[in-house]
Amino acid sequence: MESKSVLLDRELKNVCLEKGEKLAVVTINRPKALNALTSETLRELDYVIEDLENDNDLYCVILTGSGEKSFVAGADIAEMKDLNAKEAEEFGLLGNRVFRRLEKLDKPVIAAISGFALGGGCELAMSCDIRIASEKARFAQPEVGLGIIPGFGGTQRLARLVGAGKAKELIYTGSMIKADEALNIGLVNKVVPLENLMEEAKAMATLIASNAPIAIELSKYAIDRGLQVDIDRAIEIEAEDFGKCFDSEDQF
């Protein structure tokens, strides 16, 4: 993919956005801090997501972290350590709002994960539709070791991805797992050599983008919405979205 940097109407210090034909790459860009998430970084990511929402020429998005050491090493402890209860709740709500907005984006998002995906980093990856990890990737929800709980949706998304029992084990122990175990438990979709990570992510994104975009959007909606309701309502949602395809420009 030939990419170009996008000049947005505000300066971004911590998040980079590149766009190519039908595809975009979003990079959390704080390598000296292992791409840890500050409130400023979350607000910048929110702004980038807004840009992606409004770009109808994009069909798929790749989200990654700068450098090989870390996808995102969690929320920035330097910012969190002095928060009181109310401030911490507001920080958690900010992260959850941004991650939920990413999750609800009308385009598929692929997380390309190298190095650490810890705490908020693991939660960010879980907010994406598909996760591709390098062999060097490491995953954990280690918050209990700091006397807190996952605050950006980890208690909910991890259980939905790997089952309640395994999620409780990982959260209660704070244990770090390697990429191959993450694959075995269903936390990631694919594990590849580090040098092939972005190539694999772009290949999958290109394949997705080669399909009908409205059908992809409706498929995402049907899956995500259906998981939140009972099976009878979920089937109705699928039927409704199936019908919408026949009024779209994509159909046949």
Describe each model-derived feature in a short phrase.
Residues 32, 36, 43, 75, ...:
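Residues at secondary-structure transition points
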Residues 4, 57, 65-101, 117, ...:
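Glycine- (often His-adjacent) and acidic-residue-rich active-site loop
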Residues 1-64, 100:
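Conserved CoA-thioester-binding segment of acyl-CoA-metabolizing enzymes
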Residues 48, 94-106, 112:
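Catalytic-core regions built around general acid/base machinery
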